[in-house]
């Protein structure tokens, strides 16, 4: 299986380290470097050769572009191409060398509704090629040496004494007989394009150890050198805080009858097309109590009430937390399912790689609901989400927060759960459903956090809110009026002074994500001021376009995720949102989008340089 991405820790730490172990390694030292370029719609219009492309299917047009742009390059088509609900054909290619993948060298092409190329992203390697196929002489370390090298270099709690190797394909093996990982580790021989412009032959060792699901690129010539590490974890009736209430301070719980949307969950939330369930389990998610933090979720406790009445007592004053576990699991199940349904309406459907057991013949890969662990015992004061490629379940862990007395349960802070679920959204869309490794550079990883905050904030907007309304992230669960971010989200520069060049002094993804969400908050209010705000729980579409500013912003940001290149920077992600608007509305909101970004230093003159961004 391809690696996942555990992202989504809403509470920042001083470093991104391997969770829960003394002497843990700082994974920031192994982040993937930014290598992508992005040719926007405006740039594509300036290329006469593109306009003369022969007409064909969107796959043929995309393939022809790669052949012309990167002549004599070896590449393969990734099998996750699809046409999104906005009419854009998304096609991705992986560069190969001697038949071996270059794992961080991708080319994504976006073909518009008119059959012409809208934009493309490119991180193909253009340096010197290895003279010979390494498979001929096999002059590289064996995979077991690579696994042991990764274990030692990253201080992993995986034991391999007595383990053996089983071949899965020509370039991939599985390790049987290990202990300490939640599933059998694997290793795949691949190249990695390095920051210095050279190419390294590596073993990509995949280890799922719970709070971290790692893809570690061990040098295939020396077993003590790790080049990069990708972490997939960036950590009836229902009585619940209904959608739009961010936490228990914003309202009371209601009893909702059949709260699912049959257009987006036609099997309901309590069935998968084969079985009708009476517990918190269905096509989109499976939720349970997980006090030991383990991986055996199937047999864990989950509420299964008579007559499907998921109605349980809860108040924030109850203690200890396990006394209200039924209410906690129910709330987590509800919020995550509403996320599924709303994101489906906005374009995160089966073809785009969403999370469902049964895709009902609508495309994509099934068997991948979200595993929802309430009151997970593997940590406190946090939450995380692991996003493997399409076809493998996502995994969310919601923890108890100990900053208040009595402790508070993350399941009841919708902003935290929406933030986590959005990690699944952004990791499946950026780079395509088959590649969950495209938000691992520092700036792209920061945007992953920012998108989570953006959707959580947009959802909680109230009818009387204006552009003068400020919001903090994580205030209730952290028992802090300031929340867990540097500044509130605000359009007032005196309340939140963050601009693009602020990133020059930031080296942590949650901090960088705060800058990104601040920019999106500006765009959000520009669009609301132009188009109004729909305060209902679902968007209203006219010719495929949300007819209000709030849902339009959410739609354009989501479309931009699928358009942008792998591991984008802020400038490229901004351009992808502009291109999304060009495709959806013919650029009707170009000025509002530009003004929002420009106010925060990401205008026309903004330049990305990891050490000296300018704006």
From Swiss-Prot:
Hydrolase among keywords: yes
InterPro entries: FTP_domain (IPR011096), Fungal_virulence_M36 (IPR050371), Peptidase_M36 (IPR001842), Peptidase_M4/M1_CTD_sf (IPR027268)
SUPFAM superfamilies: Metalloproteases ('zincins'), catalytic domain
Any Pfam family: Peptidase_M36
A Gene Ontology molecular function term of the record: metalloendopeptidase activity
Single GO cellular component term: extracellular region
Chief place where the protein resides: secreted
Cofactor: Zn(2+)
EC id: 3.4.24.-
Position of the signal peptide: 1-8
Biological process per Gene Ontology, one example term: proteolysis
Function, in words: Secreted metalloproteinase probably acting as a virulence factor.
Location of the protein in the cell: Secreted
Lineage of the organism: Eukaryota, Fungi, Dikarya, Ascomycota, Pezizomycotina
Natural source organism: Trichophyton equinum (Horse ringworm fungus)
Protein name: Extracellular metalloproteinase 1
Residues annotated as catalytic: 420
PROSITE patterns: ZINC_PROTEASE
Keywords: Glycoprotein, Hydrolase, Metal-binding, Metalloprotease, Protease, Secreted, Signal, Virulence, Zinc, Zymogen
Propeptide residues according to the Swiss-Prot or TrEMBL record: 9-235
Cofactor note: Binds 1 zinc ion per subunit.
Protein family membership: Belongs to the peptidase M36 family.
Entry superkingdom: Eukaryota
UniProt: Zn(2+) binding residues: 419, 423
Glycosylation sites: 276, 464, 583, 612
């Amino acid at each position: 299986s391809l690696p996942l991405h555990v992202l989504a820790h809403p509470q920042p730490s001083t470093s991104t380290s391997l969770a829960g172990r003394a002497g843990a390694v700082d994974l920031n030292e192994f982040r993937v470097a930014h290598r992508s370029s992005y040719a926007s719609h405006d740039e594509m219009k300036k290329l006469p050769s593109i306009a003369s492309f022969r007409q064909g299917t969107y796959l043929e047009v995309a393939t022809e572009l790669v052949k012309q742009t990167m002549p004599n390059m070896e590449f393969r088509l990734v099998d996750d191409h699809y046409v999104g609900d906005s009419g854009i054909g998304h096609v991705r290619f992986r560069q190969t060398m001697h038949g071996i993948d270059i794992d961080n060298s991708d080319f994504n092409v976006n073909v518009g509704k008119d059959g012409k190329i809208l934009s493309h992203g490119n991180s193909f390697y253009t340096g010197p090629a290895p003279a010979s196929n390494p498979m001929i002489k096999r002059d590289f370390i064996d995979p077991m040496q690579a696994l042991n090298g990764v274990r030692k270099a990253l201080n992993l709690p995986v034991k391999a004494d007595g383990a053996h190797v089983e071949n899965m394909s020509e370039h991939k093996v599985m390790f049987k007989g290990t202990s300490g990982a939640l599933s059998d580790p694997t290793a795949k021989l691949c190249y990695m394009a390095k920051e210095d412009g050279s190419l390294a032959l590596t073993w990509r060792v995949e280890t799922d150890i719970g709070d971290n699901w790692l893809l570690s690129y061990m040098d295939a010539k020396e077993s003590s050198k790790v080049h990069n590490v990708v972490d997939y974890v960036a950590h009836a009736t229902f009585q619940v805080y209904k959608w739009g209430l961010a936490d228990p301070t914003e309202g009371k719980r209601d009893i909702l009858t059949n709260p699912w949307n049959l257009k987006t969950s036609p099997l309901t939330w309590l069935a998968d097309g084969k079985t009708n369930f009476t517990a918190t389990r269905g096509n989109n998610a499976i939720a349970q109590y997980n006090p030991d933090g383990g991986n055996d979720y199937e047999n864990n406790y989950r509420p299964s009430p008579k007559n499907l009445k998921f109605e349980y007592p809860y108040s924030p004053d109850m203690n200890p937390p396990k006394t209200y576990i039924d209410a906690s699991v129910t709330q987590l199940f509800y919020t995550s399912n509403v996320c599924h349904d709303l994101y489906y309406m906005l374009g995160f459907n089966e073809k785009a790689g969403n999370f469902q057991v049964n895709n009902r013949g609508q495309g994509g890969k099934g068997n991948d609901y979200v595993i929802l662990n309430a009151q997970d015992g593997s940590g406190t004061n946090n939450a995380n989400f692991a996003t493997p490629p399409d076809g493998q379940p996502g995994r969310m862990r919601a923890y108890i927060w100990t900053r208040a007395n009595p402790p508070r349960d993350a399941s009841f802070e919708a902003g935290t759960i929406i933030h986590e679920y959005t990690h699944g959204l952004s990791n499946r869309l950026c780079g395509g459903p088959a590649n969950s490794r495209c938000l691992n550079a520092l700036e792209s990883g920061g945007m992953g956090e920012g998108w989570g905050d953006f959707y959580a904030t947009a959802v909680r907007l109230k009818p009387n809110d204006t552009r003068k309304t400020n919001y903090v992230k994580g205030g209730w669960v952290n028992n802090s009026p300031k929340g867990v971010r540097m500044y509130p989200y605000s359009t007032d520069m005196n309340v939140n002074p963050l601009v693009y060049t602020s990133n020059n002094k930031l080296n942590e993804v949650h901090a960088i994500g705060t800058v990104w969400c601040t920019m999106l908050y500006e765009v959000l209010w520009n669009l609301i001021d132009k188009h109004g705000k729909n305060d209902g729980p679902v968007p209203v579409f006219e010719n495929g376009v949300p007819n209000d500013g709030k849902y339009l912003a959410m739609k354009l940001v989501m479309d931009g995720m699928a358009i942008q290149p792998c591991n984008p920077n802020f400038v490229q992600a901004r351009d992808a949102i502009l291109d999304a608007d060009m495709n959806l509305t013919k650029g009707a909101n170009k000025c509002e989008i530009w003004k929002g970004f420009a106010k925060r230093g990401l205008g026309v003159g903004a330049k990305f340089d990891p050490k000296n961004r300018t704006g």
